[in-house]
Swiss-Prot record:
Disulfide bonds: none
Record GO biological process: arginyl-tRNA aminoacylation
Keywords: Aminoacyl-tRNA synthetase, ATP-binding, Cytoplasm, Ligase, Nucleotide-binding, Protein biosynthesis
Top-level taxonomic group: Bacteria
EC number: 6.1.1.19
A Pfam family hit: DALR_1
Name by which UniProt lists this protein: Arginine--tRNA ligase
Claim: Protein biosynthesis is one of the keywords in the record: yes
GO cellular component terms listed in the entry, alphabetical order: cytoplasm
Organism expressing this protein natively: Helicobacter acinonychis (strain Sheeba)
Molecular-function annotations in GO: arginine-tRNA ligase activity; ATP binding
Record-linked PROSITE patterns: AA_TRNA_LIGASE_I (PS00178)
Enzyme class: ligase
Length: 541
């Protein structure tokens, strides 16, 4: 609808047209400030130009049937859509059902490589991981809905010092809790009940002869064993959020290609040796300083593994590569992009989205940390507490790059203070009316819209605006727009519901048709957010 209006206006006016929503709904459904832009070109007052353009648009053959009114107001041109125009789009939308708002794959479709979560398999997923996980999953859903091809990948950091530290931590826990030895723990190690659980499970699963080997062999085996267990648990945690990856990429396997990558970096004159270390000349490409890739002890840095991984990704020639990282990784962006330039790739294809911190409260007090994980709040604990759908909604309700803090008890309330409940309640009200109505769904769908007032038309317009919201959410990586849209549409519906009788009136079928459109838009919006909308819910407010 928005796209059609924009394209027709641009054809008539032979200029790019920006379409906005008026702040006051009494001014119509759409508005454009184009007169202000043209005023400089034609050296006329925006008010005069707006009047001229409003007349031109309203009388043009291509807009007949589109608008009830086209009015110039303080330099803006305001448009009120006709009921016939709205009904045409309503009928089409209701026929499309779950495909309403979607696009077919076309020449403009993108091939997107989306990497997210990628938490080290050294412990259970905590609530900080959940934000990027939920965002990435919904972004992929929206991208596919819009006709793009998406590969979702989890990069498994299954080698290096962190994995060895995991094995060491399990070995020390084994000695303390299984062998009952006195143990001195290092300053840095993995702690929490999950480490003890792994140690005890290793005692039952692994051959007793292993624990008679030298310590390095034991740590190596326990590192691999614990890593595999944690990865299984991570997959279970993600499954509880409704998240499934197309691919799990092993750093250990990918890093086998390091020699070829380093050879290409050498050819590009990207490396040098200093202080017995190998450095990347990343400062040549907007990085703050050069970065170490190989340390004095000949071990590789985390960045070296990241470079090899990105080389593997870029060899696959996707249109766009999106990484979702924690905000604490912001310093890595410049150095990774520098390596891509040295390797001959277009670094602009890489977009890194940063997920800010999450603060969880319960009754206005900090949420209790998990004993099992030490000083973290586990995803599993929060999902068990409030459910996957509430967690997904609240995590998507603010921009990814802004701090998020919320009280989980708000999401347990059955009143308008709980946004997800209020949206479910709107859909529940609609389905209850449809059940009570003597009319079949087919009768309602075939009913022409002829007698709607301004408020009813605006509710219908809001429900039909979903496609534009979906596109904007994807293009701006602003998935909070979907949450805001669903909340606003639900609120408008509740106002409509409370304003007067819907059943047993002369225009009941018309009003129920609006309700069907609202339900469809709420259902499709929630589906893209990874939430199943409810059709039955009790009200206590």
């Amino acid at each position: 609808m928005h796209t059609l209006i924009k394209s027709v206006l641009e054809e008539i006016l032979e200029a790019e047209v920006i379409i906005e929503h008026p702040k006051d709904r009494e001014h119509g459904h759409y508005a454009t400030p184009i007169a202000f832009n043209l005023a400089k070109i034609f050296k006329k007052s925006p008010l005069v130009i707006a009047e001229e353009l409003a007349l031109k648009i309203s009388t043009h053959a291509k807009t007949q049937g589109f608008f009830d009114s086209v009015v110039a107001c303080k330099g803006y041109i305001n448009f009120t859509l006709s009921l016939d125009f709205l009904e045409r789009f309503t009928q089409k939308a209701l026929e499309l059902k779950e495909k309403f708002g979607s696009k077919f794959k076309s020449e403009n479709s993108q091939k997107i490589f989306l990497e997210f979560v990628s938490a080290n398999p050294t412990g259970p997923l905590h609530i900080g991981h959940a934000r990027g996980a939920v965002f990435g999953d919904s972004l992929a859903k929206i991208a596919r809905f819009l006709g793009h091809e998406v590969l979702c990948e989890y990069y498994v950091n299954d080698m290096g010092s962190q994995i060895r530290l995991l094995g060491l931590s399990v070995w020390l826990a084994y000695r303390e809790h299984v062998l009952k030895e006195g143990v001195t723990y290092p300053e840095v190690f993995y702690k929490g009940e999950y480490i003890i659980e792994i140690a005890k499970k290793a005692h039952n699963d692994l051959e007793p002869s292993l624990f008679k080997e030298n310590e390095e062999t034991i740590i190596e085996v326990l590192s691999s064993y614990a890593k595999d267990l944690m990865l299984l648990e991570i997959k279970d945690n993600l499954d509880s959020l409704g998240i499934h990856f197309d691919s799990y990429a092993s750093e250990k396997e990918i890093f086998k290609h390091k020699d070829a990558v380093f050879k290409n970096l050498e050819k590009a004159n990207a490396l040098y040796e200093k202080d017995s270390k190998i450095w990347l000349k990343s400062s040549l490409y907007q990085d703050e300083s050069d970065r170490v890739l190989v340390k004095e002890d000949k071990n590789y840095t985390y960045l070296a593994g990241d470079i090899v991984y990105h080389n593997e990704k870029f060899k696959q020639n996707y249109t766009k590569y999106i990484n979702i990282w924690g905000a604490d990784h912001h310093g890595y962006i410049a150095r990774v992009k520098a390596s891509l330039k040295f390797l001959g790739y277009d670094s602009n294809k890489l977009e890194v989205l940063l997920a800010q911190m999450v603060g969880l409260l319960k009754d206005n007090e900090p949420y209790k940390m998990s004993k099992r994980a030490g000083n973290f709040i586990l995803i599993k604990d929060v999902v068990d507490d409030i459910g996957k759908d509430a967690l997904r909604f609240i995590f998507l309700s603010k921009r990814l790059d802004t701090h998020l803090e919320f009280d989980v008890n708000t999401l347990k309330k059955q009143d308008s203070s709980n946004p997800i409940y209020y949206i479910h309640y709107a859909n529940s009200r609609i389905h209850t009316m449809l059940e009570k109505s003597p009319f079949s769904k087919e009768e309602i769908l075939q009913t022409p819209l002829k007698n709607l007032n301004a408020e009813e038309k605006y509710l219908l317009f809001s429900a039909l605006s979903l496609p534009k919201i979906i596109e904007a959410s994807f293009e701006e990586y602003g998935l909070q727009k979907m949450c805001e849209y669903a909340k606003t549409l639900a609120s408008e519906f509740h106002r409509f519901y409370n304003a007067g009788k819907i059943l047993d009136t002369p225009k009941t079928k018309e009003l129920l048709k609006i309700c069907l459109m609202v339900s469809l838009s709420l259902t499709n919006a929630f589906k893209l957010l990874g939430i199943e909308i409810k059709t039955k819910i009790s009200a206590k407010d």
